[in-house]
């Protein structure tokens, strides 16, 4: 977005909040497709002539306004030429440009708030693994957790109402309604999972923006309750919330909810309440009793239905005891268990033993869902037996090995925080044997005969465990260093879940 300022003249729109004219600016659509990073490309690209593109944009918007949504059937919507149902290039350009333009007011507010507060960004907080050190520190001291499936809005108008408090351009909001209705089935008043799936695939950037705006409103209540109940205002909380909320609206939350919640219920003023979220799933953990957790459950359901006008029911929130149930979160099974330890104390001439059993958060690789993902990708069958994977005949043996090695490394990298490595070793075994069977099938041989025929160094890198690299690089590495590597490691460069790991 920093590169866009020279083209979009954001200082002018900062004062007037007029976004509608940007729809008719040629460079908005060029920037949406990556042509704006070099200003000379705008002049050299024949397909982006100002006059012709402006006429295309006007024609598409006029066509959209003239549609009669009351007579369009479900079959007709599949053949709708707008928004790329027939993969029309100009419709795609218009929708992508719209997605960039609608982000401008939020980007300006984020920049101004960061400059005023002098907040230093910590990009390591973007890593998925940065959540687990927080869980390891807090969850062993908590008793119950509420697994929450975040509800989706029942009508498209809710998304427009969410944005109208921040986007002041009425013409632009009016056009936004037509965009949203065009993406959905016009004969349906309720948003379905199928329409959401089509929406997210046809324009992922626009979908993510609307989803983050909606989640931002949903999570605002948690920040408001924290500010009302907390006596110590930690400066780090603003930085952490910047990653979750994206737009830094702490002052705005206090104004919005102060009138709606003049008196905060006592059970909401819980200093031991902790909240984490990833995508559409969140966890609310507390040291409260089951009675208070059920009050939280009832409160959240009523809040969603009455204040945010979204459909929800009690079954979307499951309350579990942390010591007896595992959390299925971020493709890990996490549970709190006691870790017994014996400590020997020496006082003068007397010595005695102390039995200590502190709670510890266990993070385990979900072996059954992961084998299901491998079976779906044709690496093994349903019970985990490795099979040969169909591959292109023109690929060399080294290319096939490198592809399997890349998958194995990615999985090992993501599950490096597992407290038990046994399940990960089984997954590696499936991938390695599947690679051998794939190569044997290519050479029209059996796996055993193929291994006898090739050189032992052929699979050396593929069969070398990650822990063995420490010994190869540092031959005299200490025992403590090797033990540290065999433990849990959380990486700060993982920003998304591997496709095979994402079984949720």
Curated annotation (Swiss-Prot):
Pfam families: Intron_maturas2 (PF01348), MatK_N (PF01824). Coiled coil: none annotated. GO terms for molecular function: RNA binding. It is found in: Plastid, Chloroplast. Keywords: Chloroplast, mRNA processing, Plastid, RNA-binding, tRNA processing. InterPro entries: Domain_X, Maturase_MatK, Maturase_MatK_N. Its main location: plastid. It comes from the Eukaryota. The keyword ATP-binding does not apply. GO terms for cellular component: chloroplast. GO terms for biological process: mRNA processing; RNA splicing; tRNA processing. Belongs to the intron maturase 2 family. MatK subfamily. Usually encoded in the trnK tRNA gene intron. Probably assists in splicing its own and other chloroplast group II introns. This is Maturase K.
